[in-house]
């Protein structure tokens, strides 16, 4: 974390596409994010690069489960009804989408071994993350920049 005169430096000129304002750059390093310990373990916790995965009342998906820093479920955007260029407000403004993502996230936590039963999901509300991917597409980010999108996490 950048520090100036003993104080955290929050301002700066580092820009991250998709973030609306520049700030101080915080560099991080992952030594071995899938290392055993705490919540570490296999990078692919199911043992597969791609799983055929059933989420009750939602559907069957080709999914990749990765535990490398932040446990994440990768899904094809089209398989969940998106194009892959949706902005945050599009998802956050849709209560049905949020409920669907929460169910996917909860069942993903079980699939990844992060919890033992779906009933434990409420106690683990932030992971795994869901990333939906699509073919690269050009779109305008929330900050107004033209981007060629490869992946969007939620």
Question: Predicted segments — roles?
Answer:
Residues 1-154:
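Active-site proximal loop and beta-alpha junction motif in alpha/beta enzyme cores
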């Amino acid at each position: 974390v950048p520090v100036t005169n003993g104080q955290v430096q929050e301002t700066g000129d580092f820009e991250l596409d998709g973030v609306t304002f520049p700030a101080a750059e915080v560099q991080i390093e992952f030594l071995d994010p899938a290392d055993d310990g705490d919540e570490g373990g296999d990078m692919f916790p199911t043992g597969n690069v791609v799983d055929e995965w059933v989420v009750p009342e939602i559907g069957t998906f080709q999914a990749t489960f990765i535990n490398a820093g932040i446990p994440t479920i990768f899904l094809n955007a089209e398989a969940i009804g998106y194009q892959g260029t949706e902005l945050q407000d599009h998802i956050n403004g849709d209560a049905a989408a949020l409920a669907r993502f929460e169910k996917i996230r909860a069942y993903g936590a079980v699939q990844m071994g992060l919890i033992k039963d779906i009933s434990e999901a409420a106690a683990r509300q932030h992971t795994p993350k869901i990333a939906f991917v699509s073919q690269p597409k050009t779109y305008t980010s929330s900050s107004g920049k033209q981007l060629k999108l490869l992946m969007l996490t939620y």
